[in-house]
A protein has these predicted regions:
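Active-site segments that bind and position negatively charged phosphate/pyrophosphate groups
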Residues: 1-109
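C-terminal charged capping/lid subdomain of soluble metabolic enzymes
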Residues: 77-160
């Protein structure tokens, strides 16, 4: 976000949105889980990088959000134009994500062992929050995907 005024507005707006969700779901059992969008992939990225300074938490989350949106497109929960809109927003505002790796199916597959470690998983399935459109995610725990299914999606994810 190029202008300081716009940046301050975006930060205030983000904080107010987060406060809205946290105050209505203090135990993180339902509505508040929406704030985890992108974090399943992000935490895998951070673990893979040994929490090094190569990638910040914010960059990992931005990358995780793009991967989650790509998965949303594959699952036909989201339209590709939404993915393009968000990628354009990132680019326009110089928001960094690991673009060079995000289209590499081997790199995406290398996240699988770390995705298995996510605390939100159950029954050998990985829980993902997917995006339907800007501002609207899936209900928590709606998309449970096995590691085998996700492995099949890796090549497709890399194409978008």
């Amino acid at each position: 976000l190029k202008q300081t005024k716009e940046l301050v507005y975006a930060i205030k707006k983000s904080c107010n949105i987060k406060l809205h969700f946290v105050s209505r779901d203090t135990n993180e059992k339902n509505l508040r889980m929406i704030l985890n969008f992108g974090h399943t992939f992000a935490h895998a990225i951070e673990i893979k990088n040994n929490y090094s300074k190569k990638i910040t938490h914010g960059e990992a989350v931005l990358t995780g959000m793009i991967l989650a949106i790509k998965l949303s497109v594959i699952k036909r929960y989201c339209k590709i134009k939404t993915l393009k809109l968000i990628k354009n927003f990132y680019d326009k505002n110089n928001l960094t994500y690991t673009l060079k790796n995000i289209s590499n199916s081997k790199w995406i597959k290398s996240l699988l062992p770390f995705l298995k470690q996510d605390k939100k998983n159950d029954d050998e399935k990985i829980n993902f929050l997917l995006l339907n459109k800007v501002g609207k995610t899936s209900l928590p725990n709606k998309f449970k995907i096995s590691v085998k299914q996700l492995e099949k999606y890796c090549t497709t994810i890399s194409r978008y």
